[in-house]
Amino acid sequence: PSFISVFSNIFSGTAATGGFLGATVVWAFNRGVNRGLFSNEAGQGSAPIAHAAAKTEEPVSEGMVALLEPFIDTIVICSITGLVLLSSGTWLKKFENKFQQADTVVLSGAYHESDPDGKSAVSEHVLGNKPLPFYTGSLEVRNGQILNTDITLLHARSFADSVRVKEGKEVLFSGTLSVRDGRIELPMNKERAVYLTGKSLLHSAPLSTEAFKKGFLGDWGQFIIPFSLLLFAFSTTIAWSYYGDRAVTYLWGTKYVRIYHVIYIVGFFLASFTDTTIVWTLSGITVALMTLPNLIGILLLHKEVKSSVNEYWRRMKEKL
C-alpha cells in the first residue's frame, strides 16, 4: 500500500487530505532534494576531509567507498523512513502538540477546513499561488481560548484545531497577544513563557515518533527516534567538529582552532532550543554556501579526476 500510494498520488493532487495543505509534486520534490542533500552531504566537500585522513595507496578506491555513503543515507534510510510514515498514516493525521512559533501563521479572514472553497483558498496560499492577507492586530485570549472570530490559524501547513494559549506549566493564559504580518509575538518571560497548543499535522522527529508508535512495538516504538537521534547527534557532533577543525587549520592556522571550538559549542547551545523550521532554513543556506565553491573546484579538477579514475579501472582490469 505504501508503494502504491507513492505512485498513485504523485500527480493526483490529494494534498488537502487530512488537512495537509499545499503539497504538490514540485513542493515534494523540492523538500525531498533539500533533505536528501542535507542527509548525505552530496557535493559539499565534507566527506573528503574524513577520507583524506585514511591510510590508503589508492585515492580512487577510497572514493569508491565514499560513494556508498549517499546510497545508505538517502536511498536506504530515507526510503525506509518514508515507507514507515506512509504505512502508518500519521502524515495525514493531526496530533496534539506544542506549536512552534516559526510554524504558526495567522491569516486575516475566517476559513474553515470543512468548507471546500475555504480549504482550497488556504491551500493555494500555502503553495504561494494566491497569497491571502496576513493578520495584523491583537488577539484577545480568555482562559486559553482565542476570542477573535475573523482569523484563521495555521500550523505546520495545516489548519490548527482546538487551539489553547498557555503559559508556564500548563496554565491557561488570559490577556492580549500582538500579531504582526501573521506572526504572533509571544511574551518571552523566563518563568511564565507563553505558548500555543492544539491539534495539527507534525513534521520532523515528532512525526516519525508518532509513526513508530503505530508499529508492533506500540508505545515503546516512540523511543526508537530519540535513541537514533542521540546516536546521530553524537556522531555528527564529533564529525563536524573535526571537519571544521581541519578547515580552520588549513585556512588560518592552529592558533584559531580554539576560537572555532567556542563558536561551535555556542552554536549547538543556541540550536537546542530554536524552532526546527529556523534550523532547517539556516541549514539550507549553509549547505548552499558550502556546495557552490566545492562544485566549482570539482569542475576545475574534472580532468584530473577523470584521468585518475580511468587509470584505476585500467589497473583493475589488468589484475583480473
Residues of each region from the PLM?
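Selective recognition of specific alpha-helical transmembrane segments in multi-pass small-molecule
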Residues: 1, 59-89, 260-268
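Helix-loop-helix hairpins and the membrane-proximal interhelical loops
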Residues: 1-31
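Hydrophobic alpha-helical transmembrane segments of multi-pass small-molecule transporters/permeases
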Residues: 28, 32-36, 67-70, 195, ...
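Low-complexity, proline/glycine-enriched hydrophobic segments characteristic of transmembrane helices
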Residues: 88-216
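Transmembrane helix-loop junctions in multi-pass membrane proteins
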Residues: 1-2, 83-95, 182-183, 201-225, ...
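A generic transmembrane alpha-helix motif of multi-pass inner-membrane proteins
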Residues: 23, 30, 256-259, 263-310, ...
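Helix-loop junctions at the membrane interface of multi-pass solute transporters
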Residues: 36-41, 46-59, 65-70, 86
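C-terminal membrane-solvent junction of multi-pass transporters and transport-like membrane proteins
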Residues: 134, 138-146, 150-172, 177, ...
